[in-house]
C-alpha cells in the first residue's frame, strides 16, 4: 500500500484480483516501538476488516508482524486461518516467533516442503490439515513476460550496471543488530577481494 515500498497492491490488481479492503498500518519508523504500534494499528484495522467482510476463511502468507496482527484479529473474530509457509525457520530473526505463532493460530496449513510439513505436525497440528504444496511464489518465475533485457532492467531500477554485475541480498538478524553489522561487513570484504 505504500509508494516507498513499490505499491505492490497494484501488481495484485493487475493480476486480476479485486481487493475488498485495505489495512494501513505502517509507521514512519521501523524501531521496535514503532513496530509494536504498527501491530496495534493492524489489530484495529484487521478486526474491522474481518467484521465487515465476514469471510469463511482468512488466508495468511508468511511471518511478518503485519501477518501476525491479521492472524490475532482473525482468531479473536472467529475467522479460521489457512497459513501458507509455516514450519520454516529463520534463525536470529523475530519472524521465527511470528511464523510459529501464526501456525499455532491456524486451522489449516500449506507448507512449501515435506520437511516443513513435518515440523508443523511436530508443533502439534493435525496431519490431516497440513499440506505440502510447494512455494506459491515460485510459479511466477516460469513466466516469460517477467524476463527483462539488461537495458529494460537498468531503466526499471534507474541504475546503469557495470559490464559484470553481481546481485547480493542479505537478510539480517533482527534479534542481534551488532552481529548483522559484522556479518554484512564480512560480505563486503569478501566481495572486495
What is the predicted role of each segment?
Residues 1-38, 45:
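Conserved nucleotide-sugar phosphate-binding/catalytic loop shared by glycosyltransferases and other
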Residues 1-6, 106-180:
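A nucleotide-sugar donor-handling region in carbohydrate enzymes
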Residues 4, 8, 70, 94, ...:
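Residues at alpha-helix caps and immediate loop-helix transition turns in enzyme cores, especially N-
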Residues 10, 100, 118, 188-189:
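Active-site phosphate/pyrophosphate- and oxyanion-stabilizing loops and adjacent acidic/basic residues
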Residues 21, 33-40, 44-53, 132, ...:
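PLP-dependent amino-acid enzyme catalytic core
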Residues 23-28, 81-86, 134, 167-172:
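Short beta-strands and strand-loop turn motifs
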Residues 26-127:
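Active-site and donor-binding regions of nucleotide-sugar-utilizing enzymes
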Residues 182-193:
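Short hydrophobic signal-anchor/transmembrane segments that target glycosyltransferases
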Amino acid at each position: 500500500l505504500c509508494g516507498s515500498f513499490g505499491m505492490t497492491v497494484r501488481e495484485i490488481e493487475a493480476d486480476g484480483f479485486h481487493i475488498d479492503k485495505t489495512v494501513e498500518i505502517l509507521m514512519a519508523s521501523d524501531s521496535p516501538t514503532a513496530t509494536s504500534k504498527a501491530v496495534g494499528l493492524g489489530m484495529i484495522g484487521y478486526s474491522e476488516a474481518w467484521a465487515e467482510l465476514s469471510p469463511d476463511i482468512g488466508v495468511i502468507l508468511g511471518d511478518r508482524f503485519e501477518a501476525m496482527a491479521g492472524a490475532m484479529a482473525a482468531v479473536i473474530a472467529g475467522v479460521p486461518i489457512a497459513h501458507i509457509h509455516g514450519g520454516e525457520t529463520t534463525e536470529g530473526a523475530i519472524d521465527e516467533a511470528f511464523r510459529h505463532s501464526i501456525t499455532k493460530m491456524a486451522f489449516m496449513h500449506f507448507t512449501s516442503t515435506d520437511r516443513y510439513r513435518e515440523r508443523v505436525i511436530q508443533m502439534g497440528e493435525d496431519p490431516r490439515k497440513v499440506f505440502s504444496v510447494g512455494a506459491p511464489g515460485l510459479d511466477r518465475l516460469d513466466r516469460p513476460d517477467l524476463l527483462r533485457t539488461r537495458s529494460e532492467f537498468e531503466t526499471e531500477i534507474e541504475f546503469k550496471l557495470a559490464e559484470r554485475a553481481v546481485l547480493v541480498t542479505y537478510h539480517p538478524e533482527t534479534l542481534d543488530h551488532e552481529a548483522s553489522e559484522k556479518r554484512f561487513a564480512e560480505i563486503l570484504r569478501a566481495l572486495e577481494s
